[in-house]
C-alpha cells in the first residue's frame, strides 16, 4: 500500500515505515503529523483524487530536524577578475510514516 502526498509544493510517494526528508516544518521530535493533502492511494485498487482523495490521511512522527550537506555555488567570469563563491545548506525535517488511512 502506498500514497502520494503533497507537502511544501512537492509530491512524495510514501509507504508505511518510510523515512522521508521534508522541507523544514519547525516541529519538535516525537510530534505527530497528519498529511491531509493526499493525491492518490493504492491499496489493491488505485484511488486518484480530484485534486485530493476524500477522507484519506497519512500519519507520521517527526524523528528530527537537521541540515543537509553543503552545496557550493561558484561563478567565475574569465579574464574579468570576477568570481563569487556561495554556500547553501538545506534545512529539513525527517518524518517516519506510521499509517496510511484511506
Curated annotation (Swiss-Prot):
Keywords: Ribonucleoprotein, Ribosomal protein, RNA-binding, rRNA-binding
A single BP term in Gene Ontology: translation
Pfam families in UniProt: Ribosomal_L21p
Domain of life per record: Bacteria
InterPro entries in UniProt: bL21-like, bL21-like_sf, Ribosomal_bL21, Ribosomal_bL21_CS
GO molecular function: rRNA binding; structural constituent of ribosome
One GO CC annotation: ribonucleoprotein complex
Keyword Lyase in annotation: no
Quaternary data: Part of the 50S ribosomal subunit. Contacts protein L20.
Family: Belongs to the bacterial ribosomal protein bL21 family.
Function noted in UniProt: This protein binds to 23S rRNA in the presence of protein L20.
UniProt protein name: Large ribosomal subunit protein bL21
Classification lineage: Bacteria, Pseudomonadati, Campylobacterota, Epsilonproteobacteria, Nautiliales
Gene that encodes it: rplU
Amino acid at each position: 500500500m502506498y500514497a502520494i502526498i503533497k507537502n511544501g509544493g512537492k509530491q512524495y510517494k510514501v509507504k508505511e515505515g518510510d523515512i522521508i526528508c521534508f522541507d523544514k516544518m519547525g516541529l519538535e521530535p516525537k510530534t505527530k503529523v497528519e498529511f491531509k493533502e493526499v493525491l492518490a492511494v493504492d491499496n489493491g485498487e488505485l484511488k486518484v483524487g480530484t485534486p485530493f482523495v476524500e477522507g484519506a490521511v497519512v500519519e507520521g512522527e517527526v524523528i528530527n530536524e537537521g541540515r543537509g550537506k553543503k552545496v557550493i555555488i561558484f561563478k567565475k567570469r574569465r579574464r574579468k577578475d570576477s568570481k563569487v563563491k556561495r554556500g547553501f545548506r538545506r534545512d529539513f525535517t525527517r518524518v517516519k510514516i506510521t499509517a496510511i488511512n484511506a
